[in-house]
């Protein structure tokens, strides 16, 4: 495991994930926020954790496996590829956006070096590219959370202004202001939209953590909501090897034999229902349990 920075715990705890939700963590590595989102699902719904970097996605997968999550899929794709596949699919989306990392300067010299080499303009552009695609994937009635670990208005208030300009059904909702949390600053936006006060800034001199920014955005319900994503439903009869394995598992573990699948001797615990991820760079669907070798389980 690794110890998550205190301020970095805020985004996943604030996003109001409910049982049965279909959730996307689009910039998920190394996985701390994804594990919190999965915990809030209580084994229901489905979580897609994505990171565009294949090497970072492997680290993400390792942490999700350690957490024992079965109702999940880890992919490594660009946002535009995901939006083509998952149009209006997700009830909740977490965007922990790549940023200049100003909030981490006192903790990490590497963040200072990255800022000197790239500046805020590069990251503001990356964020807008992600937001262009994420807005397409959120269901009407759904909620997304945008966060960064930087101070710059270009990557925070101004990125939220940009997001709101993409779709007139989007609206800011108030981020819970825990002790030490401050409002977003409308004066730092280009339009000075008073609604930006609903965002939250976490300043390191006010809290026992590093700098962070959090915004909650809701997409209003449409008159008619269509289901665009195709879903794969699991069958109810496990194969022979899975059946034998299940007989040795305590019922207290909460494992259902119908959700165990075998692939070349490897057993996986899968969700009852999951989105179709064909055509995507998928690292793992479900939880790897072990292998059947010479009539024994390893």
What does each model-identified segment do?
Residues 210, 218-298:
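Polybasic, low-complexity RNA-engagement segments
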């Amino acid at each position: 495991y690794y110890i998550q920075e205190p301020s970095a715990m805020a985004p996943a705890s604030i996003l109001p994930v409910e049982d049965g939700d279909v959730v996307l963590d689009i910039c998920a590595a190394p996985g701390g926020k994804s594990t919190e989102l999965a915990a809030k699902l209580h084994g229901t719904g489905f979580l897609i954790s994505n990171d565009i970097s294949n090497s970072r996605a492997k680290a993400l997968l390792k942490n999700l496996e350690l957490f024992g999550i079965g109702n999940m899929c880890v992919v490594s794709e660009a946002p535009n590829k995901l939006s083509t596949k998952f149009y209006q699919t997700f009830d909740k989306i977490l965007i922990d956006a790549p940023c200049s990392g100003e909030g981490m300067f006192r903790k990490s010299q590497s963040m200072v070096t990255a800022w000197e080499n790239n500046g805020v303009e590069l990251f503001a552009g990356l964020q807008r590219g992600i937001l262009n695609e994420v807005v397409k994937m959120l269901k009407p009635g759904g909620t997304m959370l945008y966060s960064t670990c930087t101070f710059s208005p270009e990557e925070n208030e101004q990125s939220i202004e940009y997001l709101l300009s993409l779709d007139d059904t989007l609206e800011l909702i108030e981020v819970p202001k825990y002790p030490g949390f401050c409002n977003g600053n409308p004066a730092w936006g280009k339009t000075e939209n008073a609604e930006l006060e609903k965002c939250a800034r976490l300043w390191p001199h006010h809290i026992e953590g590093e700098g962070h920014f959090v915004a909650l955005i809701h997409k209003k319900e449409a008159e008619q909501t269509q289901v665009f994503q195709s879903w794969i439903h699991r069958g109810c009869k496990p194969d022979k090897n899975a059946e034998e394995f299940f007989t040795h598992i305590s019922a207290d573990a909460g494992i259902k034999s119908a959700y165990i699948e075998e692939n070349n001797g490897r057993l996986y615990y899968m969700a009852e229902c999951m989105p179709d991820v064909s055509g995507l760079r998928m690292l793992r669907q479900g939880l790897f349990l072990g292998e059947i070798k010479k009539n024994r389980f390893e």
